[in-house]
Amino acid sequence: MSTAEMRAKLERAREAQARRFTAGDRMDCNARIPERRFRELCAMEAPAEALFLAALRSLKVSARARGHIVRLARTIADLEGSDRIAERHVAEAVGYRGRDSR
């Protein structure tokens, strides 16, 4: 992927985030999504949610790390142009988090 292609992909992801947040939100990117809004703003497909819950059990991550995984999966989905978080997005996010998330 060229630099120009990557830049365009990132710009589309940022545009998706801008559309997601309303004027009254105190958020401008996925990193600022509060946990109470996860269900609304970070909708997961059923297989993605199953993988997420299985990963939480097996990795025994902290509550804070759980939030990081959800936000990261949302960002990965945005980079792909996906409205919902898919299983592959969760798998990638969990892979980035690794075992250092305890």
Predicted regions: what they are:
Residues M1-R102:
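Basic, amphipathic alpha-helical bundle interface domains used for macromolecular binding and assembly
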